[in-house]
């Protein structure tokens, strides 16, 4: 089965069902968790620079608020779909639960290729999206954040639009803002930092010396780039890098002696791709996945690792920096082959953890140093990893199953206390 054949919403549901079954949960728990409590669909009219009106479709899925307000990013991508945001909101519920932050899961998106829009069109689209959903979000209701192809500037426009519409001064309604506008120090690097911490902890359990580890990373966006830089700080060597560009589609580069993270970022900024990155040779995507490395880190979009890809991977450890990069069939292959996979809801939870820190700082008007933020994030990530590893060993299950079991237990207890079942 190819990655494109997998329905991510059905995949998320099957992961939840599997964990509920392993825990022996009452049927009511799965019934309450298998669908989002609310999915908003909006049509966004945007006045284009040429004077014409174009409408864009947007979504916001709010999965479960038993523990607290729903939380999750907004992505701008041509492949956004209703099922995708529903799946991502489910994963967010359990990602928040994994690290113990008091949120449920939310996710949003607009079907658009933002590279085709001018700055003015992008701003009008961003504000138009908030016009469509503002009555159903808020600091204590649903707190969006950046995701694929969105950033601090877009979040700032959205906060401004929300405040204009509500007559409030409510900067905590959205996180991932620039530091100058209520953002948290350390937020930009948070997800990648958390990925590196998770990789370090898992590597230690498997007897992999991080200072000698060879690493392959797919994707050099925000998450991938900070993953590379932080893995380098821990002594790891990134030898293979996969990316995507319009002219070539998916491609990969390799250097057995290592690819310098900062040099790659500088080159990307100047050239828009890594096709001719100095000192690296071009390899196929198949060669990338099968490269002789200790750790593979997918940091791109969903369903990148199919059954065929999983069968070719030589690494002992796979760390899911992206959301849903591994198909269920690939999961089975990893389990059969004894390859340890740290799941997305754990591996990339550093981002939402520091988003929570930003929200807390906004609510209290008291801000922490970057060192404090990083230290708090590391403590949360290590604690979550240890809890999940313990369940993995105790129940003899995969890390993904353990992560869902760990988080579903907590959400189910909150639902029971509320009298939902």
Curated annotation (Swiss-Prot):
Going by the UniProt record, its keywords in alphabetical order are: NAD, Oxidoreductase
Instruction: List the SUPFAM superfamilies hit by this protein, alphabetically.
Output: Aminoacid dehydrogenase-like, N-terminal domain, NAD(P)-binding Rossmann-fold domains
Query: Where exactly are the transmembrane stretches of this chain?
Result: none
Assembly mode:
Homohexamer.
Q: Which residues form the active site?
A: 107 (proton donor)
| Pfam families given in the database record | ELFV_dehydrog, ELFV_dehydrog_N
Record-stated family: Belongs to the Glu/Leu/Phe/Val dehydrogenases family.
Q: Where does NAD(+) bind?
A: 191, 222
GO terms for molecular function, please? glutamate dehydrogenase (NAD+) activity
Statement: the UniProt record of this protein carries the keyword Oxidoreductase: yes
Which reaction does this chain catalyze? L-glutamate + NAD(+) + H2O = 2-oxoglutarate + NH4(+) + NADH + H(+)
**Biological process annotations from GO:** amino acid metabolic process; glutamate catabolic process
EC number annotated for this UniProt entry: 1.4.1.2
Q: Which organism is it from?
A: Clostridioides difficile
Residues under site feature: Important for catalysis: 147
Disulfide cross-links: none
Q: Where does substrate bind?
A: 71, 95, 355
- Protein name per UniProt: NAD-specific glutamate dehydrogenase
| Superkingdom of the source species | Bacteria
């Amino acid at each position: 089965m190819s990655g494109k054949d997998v329905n991510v919403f059905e995949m998320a549901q099957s992961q939840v069902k599997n964990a509920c079954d392993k825990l022996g949960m009452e049927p009511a728990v799965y019934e309450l968790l298998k669908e989002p409590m609310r999915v908003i669909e909006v049509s966004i009219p945007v006045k284009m620079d040429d004077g014409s009106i174009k409408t864009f479709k947007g979504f916001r899925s709010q999965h479960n608020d038993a523990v607290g307000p729903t939380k999750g990013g907004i992505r701008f991508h041509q492949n956004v779909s209703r099922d995708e945001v529903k799946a991502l909101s489910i994963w967010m519920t359990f990602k928040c639960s994994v690290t113990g932050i008091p949120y449920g899961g939310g996710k949003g998106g607009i079907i658009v290729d933002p590279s085709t829009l001018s700055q003015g069109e992008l701003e009008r689209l961003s504000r138009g999206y908030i016009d469509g959903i503002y009555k159903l979000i808020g600091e204590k209701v649903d707190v969006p954040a950046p995701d694929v192809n969105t950033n601090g500037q877009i979040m700032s426009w959205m906060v401004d639009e929300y405040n204009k519409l509500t007559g409030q001064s409510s900067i905590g309604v959205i996180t991932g803002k620039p530091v100058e506008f209520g953002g948290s120090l350390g937020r930009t690097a948070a997800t990648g930092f958390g990925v590196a911490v998770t990789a370090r902890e898992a590597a230690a359990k498997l007897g992999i010396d991080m200072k000698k580890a060879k690493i392959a990373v797919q994707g050099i966006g925000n998450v991938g780039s900070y993953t590379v830089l932080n893995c380098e700080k821990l002594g790891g060597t990134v030898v293979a890098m996969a990316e995507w560009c319009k002219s070539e589609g998916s491609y990969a580069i390799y250097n057995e002696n290592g690819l310098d993270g900062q040099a790659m970022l500088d080159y990307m900024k100047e050239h828009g791709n890594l096709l001719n990155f100095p000192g690296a040779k071009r390899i196929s995507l198949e060669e990338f996945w099968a490269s002789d490395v200790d750790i593979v880190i997918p940091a791109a979009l969903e369903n990148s690792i199919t059954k065929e890809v999983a069968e070719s991977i030589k690494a002992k450890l796979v760390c899911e920096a992206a959301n849903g990069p591994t198909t269920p069939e690939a999961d089975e292959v990893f389990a059969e082959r004894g390859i340890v996979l740290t799941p997305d809801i754990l591996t990339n939870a550093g981002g939402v953890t520091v988003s929570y820190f930003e929200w807390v700082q906004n609510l209290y008007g008291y801000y922490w140093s970057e060192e404090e933020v990083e230290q708090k994030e590391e403590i949360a990530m290590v604690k979550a990893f240890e809890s999940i590893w313990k369940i993995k060993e105790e129940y003899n299950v995969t890390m993904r199953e353990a992560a869902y079991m760990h988080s579903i237990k907590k959400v189910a207890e909150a639902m029971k206390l509320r009298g939902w079942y």
